[in-house]
Swiss-Prot record:
InterPro entries: PRC_barrel-like_sf, PRC_RimM, RimM, RimM_N, RimM_N_sf, Transl_B-barrel_sf
Name of the protein in its database record: Ribosome maturation factor RimM
Species of the source: Methylobacterium radiotolerans (strain ATCC 27329 / DSM 1819 / JCM 2831 / NBRC 15690 / NCIMB 10815 / 0-1)
The keyword rRNA processing is annotated on this UniProt entry: yes
Region (Disordered): 1-52
């Protein structure tokens, strides 16, 4: 299961609830396609302390009054505003005054107003600053098969031989279950792998590593066949 600080999802299928940044299990099986490239500019930040959980990351300034774009990693994106004081990747403590969906963007992209921040210049200074919450402010996973989605972001995905397959850059859910978005070792377009026990048999959160059973053509361009494909 891949929880997002407020409600868990799981490798056993469905979510048990959602409120902020969720934990989730891996579902036993899923008919979801293992491949769906989706380019992203940069991997999410890794918490500077294992006792911190990533909740969001600021982007560029929005308008002239101090608002700023914010990517939320919580199960309910707007629930990030309910966590109170948050620690930043540059050592500060910030609190969100309010958030709203960013027009024309994905549901996890918000427009935020930060307490004490006014004017475009101050908002621009927040670009690429990440927000974290202390782990002890979150509910503990209910079993060994649960993990916070934020703990997976930045983790290495390896095959059974220990060879690096890619790095997890996001844990999206489009309604059919959690997915791992993987970026190949040498960069390039990402691909999606169902977060199920069939595709992700081993979780090692402490080592920030998961073992995956990924198809050989996971990162192949649409329509491209493996070199040994007889067709």
């Amino acid at each position: 299961m891949a929880r997002r600080p407020a409600g868990p999802t799981s490798r056993d299928g469905g979510r048990r609830g959602r409120t902020s940044s969720a934990i989730g299990k891996i579902a036993p099986d899923a008919a979801t396609s293992p491949k769906a490239p989706a380019p992203r500019p940069a991997p999410p930040p890794v918490p500077p302390d294992p006792n911190l959980v990533l909740l969001g990351e600021f982007g560029r300034a929005h308008g002239l009054t101090g608002e700023v774009r914010l990517k939320s990693y919580t199960g309910d994106p707007q629930a990030i505003a309910g966590y109170g004081a948050l620690q930043t990747s540059d050592g500060r403590t910030l609190a969100l005054a309010d958030v709203r969906p960013a027009p024309g963007s994905s549901p996890d992209m918000l427009i935020a107003r930060v307490k004490g921040v006014s004017g475009r210049s101050a908002a621009e200074a927040l670009n690429r600053v990440a927000l974290f919450v202390p782990r002890d402010r979150l509910a503990a996973p209910e079993d060994d098969d649960e993990v916070y989605a934020a703990d997976l972001i930045g983790a290495a995905a390896v095959d059974e031989a220990g060879t690096l397959v890619g790095t997890i850059v996001a844990v999206p859910n489009y309604g059919g279950g959690d997915l791992l978005e993987l970026r190949p070792p040498n960069g390039g377009a990402t691909a999606l792998l169902p977060f199920t026990k069939a595709f992700v048999p081993v979780l090692d959160v402490a080592q920030r590593r998961v073992t995956v059973a990924a198809p050989e053509d996971l990162f192949a361009a649409p329509g491209e066949k493996p070199a040994d494909d007889p067709g």
